[in-house]
Amino acid sequence: LDRDDLDRWHLVEGDDMVDDGTHPLWDRNEVHEIYREWRRVFDRYDPSRSAVAEAWVLPERQYLYARPSELGQTFNFEFAKATWTYDDMHTAIEKGLKAAVESDSASTWVLSNHDVPRVATRYALPQIKATRYHQIALDWLLRDGSSYDEDRELGERRARAALLLELALPGSAYVYQGEELGLFEV
């Protein structure tokens, strides 16, 4: 696997800084010309190189990054943000499939990554709506596991079921290291 990791960097994030993709320095239209230039570089290789966007932006703009003339794929973080409820999962899947069609790209599915608590841990905690995604799990993590009761057996079963669902969906699945084992946050 030949790979370079071009990730976003946040130097400082204050309490007043939103992390939902609406900050004016994120998701600027000008970035798409840069990605089109990168695509031209990727296409000079034989075979052409692939790329995936780690774009924590508004869902309706996420698939702009996945166009064939740009990076080609983007992580579907709406799937990762879904709680273990039918409504959340169904909505994330339907939106992901629709957005992929609209951008002429493949659907992608991701349950977690290095920015959020592991899926087994999240699914072991109460599945209640919060004002920010993963708020319950982040609070639990920051309080050293003391803020909410954790049902590890339930979390492991849910995480494995979610992974099987992810792998059954059309498109590409991105499995974060340890997810296939149902590993918890440590």
What does each model-found stretch correspond to?
Residues L1-V186:
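Active-site and adjacent substrate-binding regions of carbohydrate-active enzymes
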